[in-house]
Amino acid sequence: EFTGWMLLSYKKPVKASSYAEGSAPAAQGFTESNRPKTSANFLPANLTDEECKTFWMARTNGDTEWVEIDLEAPATVYAVQVNYHDHQSNMYGRIPGLRHRYAVEGSLDGQDWVTLVDRRNNYKDVPNDYVQVDNPARVRYVRYKNIEVPTPHLAISDLRVFGIGEGKKPATVKNFKVVRQADRRDAMITWDAVKNSQGYNIRWGIAPDK
């Protein structure tokens, strides 16, 4: 069942304790001719671009590193996902004893913080950790604080924040059309584009409202 939560962190501004210099393709040993679509740098902004091949990398993997997302407006946060990036770890197969320890905090003013996710005493390997917040909070700023990672580098491809904003809900699109193709299993679906939209939800099925 759809909770109504939306991705609040997409393309939002990010600042960090540090970031590594250089470019990812060079660091990974790729040349101009064979490098994949990946991060050209290790900047904090890579955390909110929803691109799994880009990532932020701190200068160290220690417990003084952090990143902070500005949601640009207050919102109620219900879940957070941390997707770590396996950058030059040279770790293969199932290795016992790996663990990720961190905390995620939220704040309305950037000064007073509350804990959203507490993984300080976590002793499990959680490279793509999705956590529903026990006590959803109304915040504007979301901060990840690193404690321990099992890899040589602290690299994160996405820090995703889910919840409900306080803006106006989007309306139904206009001029929605469905045109069946020769093979009736196929159809062309069109509608008028909506300015500044991030995406569209299309409901389909046999019910009249789908």
Over which residues does each language-model region extend?
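Short, tryptophan-glycine- and acidic/Ser/Thr-enriched carbohydrate-recognition patches
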Residues: 21-32
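Surface loop/turn signatures of beta-propeller and other carbohydrate-active proteins
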Residues: 122
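Conserved, compact domain cores that house catalytic/ligand-binding motifs in diverse enzymes
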Residues: 202-208
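Aromatic, loop-rich ligand-recognition surfaces of beta-strand-rich domains
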Residues: 1-12, 18-21, 37, 42-117, ...
